[in-house]
């Protein structure tokens, strides 16, 4: 099943089809994670909470004591960037994701990716990196507020 190379080592509960794949993110078997962002979490009306980009940039990374592990960076991930064979950009400042509802810093993260047809994707050196859409869901482990963002990557 297709998954981006950066996500593959942390993917759990993988499910999907040739064109759409969903996975939870786990670190050492744990799904309660500290997340670093270039972006923001916004509370919305009627539970429509959002994960928003900071300008044109959204970066999501796992926080670890020995360094953050990028899961998604809108500047270099996805179909258009794989097509252009873009190199990783300079590091960007990240900040801890904090739930705006309860101020908790632990989240469960689910990612979904949409891919073009198999024939088109097979032309890439790393087909899993050639996704056209990503859906990110971050659920606070304390108050269970869910923050969602979807981004085009083509």
Residue ranges and their predicted role:
Residues 12:
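A short, highly charged nucleic-acid-interacting micro-segment common to nuclease
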């Amino acid at each position: 099943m297709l998954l981006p190379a950066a996500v593959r080592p942390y993917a759990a509960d993988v499910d999907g089809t040739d064109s759409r794949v969903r996975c939870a993110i786990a670190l050492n078997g744990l799904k309660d994670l500290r997340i670093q962002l270039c972006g923001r979490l916004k509370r919305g009306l009627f539970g429509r909470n959002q994960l928003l980009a900071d300008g044109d940039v959204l970066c999501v990374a796992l926080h670890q004591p020995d360094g953050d592990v990028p899961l998604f960076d809108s500047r270099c991930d996805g179909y258009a960037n794989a097509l252009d064979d873009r190199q990783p950009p300079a590091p960007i400042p990240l900040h801890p994701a904090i739930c705006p509802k309860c101020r908790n810093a632990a989240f469960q993260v689910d990612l979904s990716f949409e891919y073009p047809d198999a024939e088109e994707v097979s032309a890439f050196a790393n087909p899993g990196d050639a996704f056209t859409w990503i859906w990110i869901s971050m659920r606070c482990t304390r108050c269970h507020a869910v923050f969602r963002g979807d981004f085009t990557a083509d």
